[in-house]
Amino acid sequence: MRSVVAGVLLPVLVVVLIGPYTFLPSLLEYAVARDVKARLGIEKQPYVELKSDPPLRMLAGEFSGGRIVMKNTDLGNVTATRARIDLDPFDIDVWATMRKGQVVDRDPLSGDVRVDVPEWEVSRLAKAGSEIPIQDVDVQKDGVVVRSEVSVLGRRFPASIEGEPGLRDGELIFQPQGLTAAGVQVPDELADRLLAGTSFEYPLDRLPYQTTITGVEAEEGRIMLSGSVPSIPLGAYPGG
C-alpha cells in the first residue's frame, strides 16, 4: 500500500517542484515581452531574458535580474535603433502566477536603461528643437557637428557648428562650442556672437515607464542616452 501511495505522490511532488522551475521563466519572459509590446504599441515583441542566481531561487519567486531589449522602436518622441533595460533584482508571487496563468509581481520591475539614438534621428531632433535652419548633423566620437548657415554683414554663409550633446532639466540639448564659416575657423569672440540662439533643446518627457535620462554620450554615428526606469508593471497584481 505504501509503495502504491509513494508511486502516486512521487510524480505529483516532482511536478509541483519541477513545474515552476521549468515553465516559470518562459511564462514570465513572455508576459513581460507581451506587456512591453502592448504598452508601447511596437510591432515586434522585445527580447526578454530573466535570471535567477542560484536558479533554485526562482521557486521562491526571487530573480536576480535580467534584460529587456527592443530594436528599431519608437519610445514616445524618440526613435531608437536599440533600447536595453538591465533589470534590478525582483520578486514574483509564484503560486498566484501559476494559478492565474499570468505574472503576479510583488512590485513593478525597475532597472537601468541605455538607448541608441541614430544620427538621422539626432538630426530630426535638432531640426525640431532649433530656432535656426539646420541642413544636417554629423555625430562623431568626440562631439556633434551641426551644418547650418550664419549671417555676416547681411550675407549668409554655410557654417559648421561644433559642440556636444548634454542634458538640462530633462531635455536633450546641444551647446555650440566652435564655428567654421565658409571653411574658415571663426575666432571665439566673434563666434560667440554669431552662435547666439543656435543651441537647441528637445524634451525627453514622453519616454515610457517614467524613464529618467541622466547621461548622454556621443559615439560614431549615434548618441547614447542612459538613465533609469523606476516602474515596469507586469500583467497582474495581487488582488488585481
Named regions from a protein language model:
Residues 1-53, 57-60, 74-77, 235-240:
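Hydrophobic membrane-targeting and insertion signals
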Residues 43-123, 127-151:
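N-terminal beta-strand/beta-hairpin edge segment
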Residues 50, 135-137, 164, 214-217:
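Short amphipathic beta-strand and strand-loop transition segments with alternating hydrophobic
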Residues 60-62, 155-157, 194, 208:
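A generic structural micro-feature
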Residues 83-92, 133-189, 223, 228-230:
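Hydrophobic membrane/lipid-contacting segments
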Residues 97, 106-129, 163-197:
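Small-residue helix/turn framework positions
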Residues 186-240:
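Extracytoplasmic/luminal low-complexity segments enriched in Pro/Gly and acidic/polar residues
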